[in-house]
C-alpha cells in the first residue's frame, strides 16, 4: 500500500500503531498477493493524497470501492477516464446540471474536485473483485472514522455531504458548529427519486463556503 505522506500522516499516525490497523494491513497485503482487489494497491489512499487535510473544504462520503475491473481509483463515486460512468454518478451529474447548469462530461473522473478540496472518501478503502462489501468489518471503518474525527476538529468551514443511510450514520460524529451537514438519499437509481434529485447540494455547498470567506468549488468537470 502506498504510504500517506502529507499532513494526513500527522493526523492519522496514531492509528497506524494500533493493533486493529496492524491486522488490517496484514489482511489487505495478503489478499493483494492472493486475490484480485480494487482499487490498485497504489491508489488505496488516493483521497488523502489528492486532498491534504489542510485543504479540505468539502467531504463526500461513500461506502466501499467499485468492484469491477478498471473502475476504482481511490475516490468515492469516481472512475477512471475511459470507463463507463456508473449509474450513481450519472445521477450525480444530472443533479449537478439541474443545480448549477454544469455541462455533463463524457467521463467519470472526479480528480478535479479532489484537487480543489473535495475529500471523496469511502468508509471502506478496498474490496474483492466482484464482491461488494467484501472488506466491510476488517478494520477500514475504524481508520476512516479517525479521519472523520480529525475533520470534525478543524474549525474552518467544511461541508459534509452525506448521501444515503450508511453515510448519514456518521453524522453522530460531527458536532462542530463551524461545519455544514447536508443529507439526502443516495444517488443510486434505487433511491435518487426519493429526494436526491432537487436537493441542490452543490449550490448549497458553495453558498456556505462563500459565506465563510472560502473560495467555492468549481464543480464543472472538464469535458
What are these regions (language model features)?
Residues 1-10:
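Short, extreme N-terminal leader segments that mark the start of a protein/domain
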Residues 199-200:
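Polytopic transmembrane helical bundles with strong interfacial aromatic enrichment
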Residues 2, 14-162, 166-169, 174, ...:
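A polyanion-binding, active-site-adjacent surface
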Residues 196:
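C-terminal substrate-binding/active-site "lid" region of AdoMet-derived donor-dependent transferases
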